[in-house]
Every structure is written in C-alpha cells, then in structure tokens.
C-alpha cells in the first residue's frame, strides 16, 4: 500500500508525510531537490537555478522517488507524488494560500517576507512550467486526488488524523 501526498512549497507536505508515515509505521519516501542540494553541497536556490536549464535534476529526483516507493508499502511525499505514484491507495493534495505558505517558510527557514514571497511565487511558476514540459502534468489540476485538504488553520496532527480517518473509511489497512 502506498499513500501519495502532494502540495506546493509550504503547504505542509513534508511534515504531514513524515508524521503520517510515523503514525502508520510505514517508511517515508521524500527525496527532493533539497536532498540533491545536500548531496552536491550546494544551496537549494542553486539546484533550482540549474534545474531551469537541465532536466536531469527533475528526472533524477522523480526516478529516485519512484524507485524507493516501489520497494514496499510507504508514504510518498513530493510535489508530484499524486501524479507519479499511479497505484497509490490514497492520493492526498494539501493546499494553503500563498500568504500562509510564506509564513510557514519564514518560520522554517527565516528570511525577509518579500524575498520569501517572491521566491515562493517564482518557484510555483517554474515548477508548473517544468512539470508541463517534462511530464505534461498540470500541477494545478489535482481534481483526481482522493482527498484535498486546506491546511490553513490546521495543525499537522489534525491533518494526519483526517488522512487516517479517510484510510479507515475506505477500509484501507496498513
């Protein structure tokens, strides 16, 4: 059984995926550009800059994510998880306003409000463009997701509890 969780930067995707995996006793698969940045010893901004002109970064992240996900039951958390993990037992998409996402990124990483807002908006636009170009995926169309949750005003534990209730309601065992 695989559970796929997606959402834009700052929606709670990484945190919710990790908590969900922990609560269900499943491995977490969350291999992202941040992992590549750490592995290469460069900043996330530099990886994003390189990804603008080099499809290798997206393809490497997505191939690694899928390879890890196919090994066993797991929670997969990534921007494209609900699109790429086609056999997921549950596909969850997390939402939050740009203002809320910026607030969360600031809490997590610090910085200037205007810089973070500009960076987040730019990243959203670039992600959308790359996903359309590489995979013909419109990441603003998540209508096929089994569960769409607005995480604004919700703590992560509440979001995880809602997802677990959905699993139970569907009779999905873990």
Swiss-Prot record:
Chain positions recorded as ATP binding sites: 7-15
Top EC category: transferase
Coiled-coil segments on the chain, per record: none
Annotated compartments: Cytoplasm
Reaction catalysis annotation: CMP + ATP = CDP + ADP; dCMP + ATP = dCDP + ADP
UniProt similarity note: Belongs to the cytidylate kinase family. Type 2 subfamily.
Protein name: Cytidylate kinase
């Amino acid at each position: 059984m695989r559970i796929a969780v997606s959402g834009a930067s700052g929606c709670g995707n990484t945190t919710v995926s990790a908590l969900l995996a922990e609560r269900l006793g499943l491995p977490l698969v969350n291999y992202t550009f941040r992992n590549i940045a750490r592995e290469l010893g460069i900043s996330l901004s530099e990886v994003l800059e390189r990804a603008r002109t080099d499809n290798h970064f997206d393809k490497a992240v997505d191939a690694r994510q899928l390879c890890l996900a196919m090994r066993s039951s797991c929670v997969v958390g990534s921007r494209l998880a609900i699109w790429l993990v086609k056999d997921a037992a549950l596909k969850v998409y997390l939402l939050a306003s740009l203002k809320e996402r910026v607030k969360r990124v600031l809490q997590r990483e610090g910085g200037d409000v205007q810089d973070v807002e500009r960076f987040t908006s730019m990243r959203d636009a670039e992600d959308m463009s790359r996903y359309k170009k590489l995979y013909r995926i419109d990441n603003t169309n998540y209508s096929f997701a089994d569960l769409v949750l607005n995480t604004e005003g919700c703590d992560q534990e509440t979001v995880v509890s809602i997802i677990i209730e959905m699993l139970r309601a569907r009779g999905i065992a873990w």
